[in-house]
Swiss-Prot record:
It is found in: Virion. It holds the Pfam family Pox_D2. Belongs to the chordopoxvirinae D2 family. Keywords: Late protein, Virion. Transmembrane segments: none annotated. One of its GO terms (cellular component) is virion component. InterPro entries: Pox_D2. It comes from Rabbit fibroma virus (strain Kasza). This is Core protein D4. Late protein which is part of a large complex required for early virion morphogenesis. This complex participates in the formation of virosomes and the incorporation of virosomal contents into nascent immature virions. Induction: Expressed in the late phase of the viral replicative cycle. The keyword Calcium does not apply.
């Protein structure tokens, strides 16, 4: 029996099958962003550095996540001048989790998704103090 690799690869990608090697890679990464639909996580994006507000990298990641939804972009970036001045930051790689293609339309839901999307992968990896929230035990906050 001959196995058609192209068909198998297409089947796995279309059904959003996640392999254990992908899970291991995600677990070993330090900075991940969860892209959420209305009901569940759609994609996990891996970045080489943490997104921050002070250097506008947070806005670049958000611009990448919602670039295909004009209503959300207009809500998050009311000024086109500001939107155009921000550089879109693509992830190092992405692992697709589900086929949930619904977008939240409520502004509160969108903002909650954004604020709950940024995660640290490895707990034991050292993280610079300026990436950490205020608090005595950070791992309880982000886990």
């Amino acid at each position: 029996m001959e196995l058609d690799i192209k068909k198998l690869t297409d089947l796995l990608q279309n059904n959003k099958t996640v392999c254990p090697c992908d899970i291991k890679k995600i677990y070993d990464e330090r900075f991940i962003v969860l892209e959420k639909g209305r009901c569940m996580i759609r994609n996990i994006h891996v970045y080489s550095s943490a997104a921050r507000f002070d250097n506008k990298t947070m806005f670049g990641v958000i611009k990448y996540l919602y670039k295909h939804n004009e209503a959300i972009i207009d809500m998050l970036f009311p000024s086109k001048t500001v939107y155009n001045s921000i550089r879109e930051i693509a992830p190092d790689y992405t692992v697709s989790i589900s086929t949930d293609d619904t977008e939240p339309s409520n502004p509160v839901t969108v903002l909650l998704n954004i604020f709950n999307s940024f995660r640290f992968g490895k707990k034991d990896a050292p993280v610079s103090y300026y990436y950490l929230p205020f608090g005595k035990d950070v791992h309880d906050v982000i886990s």
